[in-house]
Structures are given as C-alpha cells and as structure tokens.
C-alpha cells in the first residue's frame, strides 16, 4: 500500500473518493490475494496489527473493509485498540459506546453497530477506554460476539492494538 500519511491528518476511508486511484488499486490487490489464501465457505475473520502505534493499522482496516464491501460482501470492523482507539475518528463519529461497553454488558450489539456511507460496511467503535482492555478481549463474551457476527457478516475485520509495547 503506498504511503499516504502526509496527505491526510487521520486514518479515513479514501477508496470511495477515487476508486481508480493507486491506493484503491492496492487495496483491491490485497482483497484478491486474501481470496486465494482461504477460499472455504463461511465468514472470515481478519486481524490487522503492527508492532507499534502509528504504522497505519486503522487506515488499512478502514480501506480494506471498504474495498471488500465494494465486492458485495457484508463487512464489519471491530475496534479492539482500546488504549488508542481510532476507528471513530476515521468515520467521524463519537466514541460513546462500543466494544468496551458491549463486552461488559452495558450496551447490546444492535446499539453499538454503526453504518458507514458504503453499503454493507458497518463498524463498532472501541467505546470508552477501559482499565483492562486485554481482559475484555480474551473474555468468553468476545468469543460469543465473534460467533454471532459470523452469521451476520461475510468478513469480520479487527483493528487490533499493536503487538509491541503500548
């Protein structure tokens, strides 16, 4: 994927603004390659991560999800980077409820799913920053959530926290 950071202040959906751009074509190539990795039937879960913050995980997650939705697939992005959430910024929405409130049982899934401007592309923001994000992510509730989403979406795309020090 070509470097875009200097031209945009935050990670945002770009592939819909110029579908024939180099960046959109790069994401199409990734989408096509992913189809060859696993062509079995059923919903797929894709995790996006990197070693440190600021390497473009959210940018990749948002635009890859967008290009996949262009192909007619139902896609949902989950913001699991609960220490430095950015999905809400990319879509220009507030981060009042989301994965943190969903996983503690404060909100239900229906109230946390938000719709993007692209048909078939939905997302769940991280929600308020919890004191214990890793415990929420490894909880049984998270496994149940993923199982439930597999019946609603073709692709579950997870914007993970970096794997290095945060």
Language-model features: locations:
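P-loop NTP-binding module
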Residues: 5, 12-166
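Interdomain "pre-motor" coupling segment immediately N-terminal to P-loop NTPase/helicase cores
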Residues: 1-7
């Amino acid at each position: 994927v070509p470097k875009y950071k200097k031209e945009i202040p935050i990670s945002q959906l770009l592939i819909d603004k110029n579908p024939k751009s180099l960046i959109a074509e790069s994401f199409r190539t990734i989408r096509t390659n992913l189809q060859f990795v696993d062509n079995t039937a059923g919903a797929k879960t894709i995790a996006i991560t990197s070693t440190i913050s600021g390497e473009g995980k959210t940018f990749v997650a948002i635009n890859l999800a967008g290009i996949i939705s262009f192909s007619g697939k139902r896609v949902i992005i989950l913001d699991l980077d609960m220490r430095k959430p950015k999905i809400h910024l990319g879509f220009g929405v507030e981060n009042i409820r989301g994965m943190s409130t969903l996983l503690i049982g404060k909100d239900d899934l229906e109230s946390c799913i938000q719709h993007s401007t692209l048909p078939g592309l939905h997302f769940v923001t991280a929600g308020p920053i919890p004191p214990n994000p890793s415990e929420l992510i490894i909880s049984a509730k998270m496994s149940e959530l993923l199982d439930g989403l597999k019946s609603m979406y073709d692709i579950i795309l997870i914007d993970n926290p970096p794997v290095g020090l945060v």
